[in-house]
């Protein structure tokens, strides 16, 4: 960090929770002047900068006893030595990152755009990692879409947590910039995000997430991403997690067997693999009902030739009681 000015260092510390906590603990005199650029520069120059970056080697060697030659051949001792070497490597790697690439410890803000649904303004979370476009139950009600909710398409959205899928709105007008685009929404419980713009819509309209220019480009139109101050506060401080991958939807019956509370999750990314279940039926929904129509395979093949997913085609035919035209309208 020797090539950085005190002001750059101050901004990096303020934007990095790890460094900020450490400064407050180990260098309170520096933490006290973090909001005063001039006082910070003076205090910084009076402190050996290397102190801020160095983690004492004794941190990981404390509690490690000395070993005799005979002990060195012990499996448990070898394992402890290996773990100490690994921890030292991790520490060295982190010190190198802080010194050479401090920006990697900064905050990454989510991508949001302004949209309108039935004349109601909504901040949509752009997520190319989610297969389906999501609408919260509250937002669907505010936008007047609950009357179009098809409750046969129920299930559970799985991600970091789980959330109950209430159904689908097969087509509703979505305004993005100057464009009016028909959109299919999966409506779920939860209030973390009003709307999530998933890969189905992004691919359908050949959208381009242009991070260099900070815009979402659709059919030549550029929709700017919202600035940090405009992002909904609930997601402004979301940290990346390894558990945020592998998002999917399971039928409600399968999810309830693996979790006592399938409505407790909050992650909105989904993978559309839910089968519609008949309203009022006491049977739990299944992935695909057993085929009773001898021409079902040929109908699925026709829908697949139109560009639809085979599993979704089978589910739509099941919901439409085998009617090919109705099933196609579900998928549009």
Curated annotation (Swiss-Prot):
Keyword Magnesium tagged: no
Gene Ontology biological process: proteasome-mediated ubiquitin-dependent protein catabolic process; protein transport; regulation of exocytosis
PROSITE patterns in the cross-refs: UBA
Subunit structure: Homodimer. Interacts (via UBA domain) with polyubiquitin (polyUb) chains (via Lys-48-linked polyUbs). Has weak binding affinity for monoubiquitin. According to another report, has no affinity for monoubiquitin.
Biased composition (Low complexity): 251-264
GO cellular component labels: cytoplasm; plasma membrane
Region listing for Disordered, in residue ranges: 246-298
Sites marked Involved in interaction with Lys-48-linked diubiquitin (Ub2): 318-319, 327-328
Residues in coiled coil: none
Intrachain S-S bonds: none
Signal peptide: none
Family: Belongs to the DDI1 family.
Membrane topology designation: Peripheral membrane protein
Annotated Polar residues bias: 275-286
Keyword terms of this UniProt record: Aspartyl protease, Cell membrane, Cytoplasm, Hydrolase, Membrane, Protease, Protein transport, Transport
Alphabetical list of InterPro entries matching this protein: Peptidase_aspartic_DDI1-type, Peptidase_aspartic_dom_sf, UBA, UBA-like_sf
Subcellular location: Cytoplasm; Cell membrane
Residues the record marks as site: Involved in interaction with monoubiquitin: 303, 306-307, 316, 330
CDD domains with a match to the protein in the record: RP_DDI (cd05479), UBA_Mud1_like (cd14308)
Site (Involved in interaction with monoubiquitin and Lys-48-linked diubiquitin (Ub2)): 308, 320, 331-332
Major subcellular location class: cytoplasm
Entry's free-text remark on domains: The UBA domain specifically recognizes Lys-48-linked diubiquitin units (Ub2), which is mediated by the two binding sites within a single UBA domain.
Designated name of the protein: UBA domain-containing protein Mud1
Primary role: Recognizes and binds polyubiquitin chains. Acts as a linker between the 19S proteasome and polyubiquitinated proteins via UBA domain interactions with ubiquitin for their subsequent degradation. Aspartic protease. Appears to act as negative regulator of constitutive exocytosis. May act at the level of secretory vesicle docking and fusion as a competitive inhibitor of SNARE assembly. Required for S-phase checkpoint control.
């Amino acid at each position: 960090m020797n090539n950085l000015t005190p002001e750059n260092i101050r901004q990096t510390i303020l934007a990095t929770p790890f460094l900020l906590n450490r400064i407050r603990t180990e260098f309170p005199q520096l933490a006290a002047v973090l909001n005063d650029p001039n006082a910070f520069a003076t205090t910084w120059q009076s402190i050996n900068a290397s102190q801020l970056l160095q983690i004492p080697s004794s941190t990981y060697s404390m509690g490690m006893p000395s070993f005799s030659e005979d002990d060195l051949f012990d499996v448990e001792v070898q394992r402890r030595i290996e773990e100490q070497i690994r921890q030292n490597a991790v520490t060295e790697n982190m010190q190198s990152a802080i010194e050479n690439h401090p920006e990697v410890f900064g905050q990454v803000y989510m991508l949001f755009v302004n949209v309108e649904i039935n004349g109601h303004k909504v901040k949509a979370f752009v997520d190319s990692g989610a297969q389906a476009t999501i609408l919260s139950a509250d937002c669907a009600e505010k936008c007047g879409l609950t009357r179009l909710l098809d409750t046969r398409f129920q299930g559970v959205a799985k991600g970091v947590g789980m959330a109950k899928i209430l159904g689908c709105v097969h087509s509703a007008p979505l305004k993005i910039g100057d464009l009016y685009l028909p959109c299919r929404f999966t409506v779920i419980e939860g209030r973390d995000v009003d709307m999530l713009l998933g890969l189905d819509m992004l691919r359908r309209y050949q959208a381009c997430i242009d991070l260099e220019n900070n815009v979402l480009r659709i059919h030549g139109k550029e929709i700017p991403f919202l600035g940090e101050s405009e992002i909904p506060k609930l997601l402004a401080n979301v940290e990346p997690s390894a558990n945020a991958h592998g998002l999917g939807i399971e039928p409600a019956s399968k999810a309830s067997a693996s979790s006592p509370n399938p409505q407790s999750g909050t992650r909105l990314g989904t993978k559309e693999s839910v089968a519609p279940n008949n309203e009022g039926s006491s049977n739990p929904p299944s992935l695909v009902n057993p085929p009773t129509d001898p021409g079902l395979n040929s109908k699925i093949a026709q829908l697949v030739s139109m560009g639809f997913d085979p599993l979704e085609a089978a589910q739509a035919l099941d919901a439409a009681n085998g009617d090919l035209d109705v099933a196609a309208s579900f998928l549009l």
